[in-house]
């Protein structure tokens, strides 16, 4: 019995020593995934099953010309947010009772005022003078 155990141990150690010792392949590190924006409210999904024409629809904080529709996944309120486009020229209107794509002047999308680009060459587009005019 001892001879068999000794022989088996010797074979296992010998096999382990005979294996090539290649360094493990480097796997690139991936940045952790951030959770995508999900406005789907479990209670609304449970209550409405998102079946009504205005149920489970939300504004998209990233775009005025799209909205988010929640698609139910199960009975406990989990839902998948799906970004849907508005027709060309329309924006999302999230007013109670509406929740549809509407003309921009009727949309509830926050208006983003474009910031003016700074002009090159100093203040107001003119080069700053080096000396004081009285000297």
Curated annotation (Swiss-Prot):
Task: Name any Gene Ontology BP term.
Answer: effector-mediated suppression of host innate immune response
Keyword set for this entry? Chitin-binding, Disulfide bond, Signal, Virulence
Q: TM spans, by residue?
A: none
Name all Chitin-binding type-2 domain ranges. Answer: 47-111
Q: Which GO cellular component term is one of those annotated?
A: extracellular region
* Residue ranges listed under propeptide: 19-29
Tell me the segments the record calls region Disordered: 19-39, 112-135
Function statement: This necrosis-inducing peptide induces a hypersensitive response on Cf-4 tomato genotypes. Race-specific elicitors are compounds which only induce defense responses in genotypes of host plants which are resistant to the pathogenic race that produces the elicitor, but not in susceptible genotypes.
What is the name attached to this protein's record? Race-specific elicitor A4
Which gene underlies this protein? AVR4
């Amino acid at each position: 019995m001892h001879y068999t155990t000794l022989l088996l141990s010797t074979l296992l150690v010998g096999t382990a020593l005979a294996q090539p010792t290649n360094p493990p392949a480097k796997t690139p590190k991936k940045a952790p995934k951030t959770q995508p924006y999900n406005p789907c409210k479990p209670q609304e999904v449970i209550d409405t099953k998102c079946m009504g024409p205005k149920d489970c629809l939300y504004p998209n904080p990233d775009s005025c010309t799209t909205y988010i529709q929640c698609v139910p996944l199960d009975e406990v309120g989990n839902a998948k947010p799906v970004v849907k486009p508005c027709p060309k020229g329309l924006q999302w209107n999230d007013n109670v009772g509406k929740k549809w794509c509407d003309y921009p002047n009727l949309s509830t999308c926050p208006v983003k005022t474009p910031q003016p680009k700074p002009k090159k060459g100093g203040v107001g587009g003119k080069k700053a003078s080096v000396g004081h005019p009285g000297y």
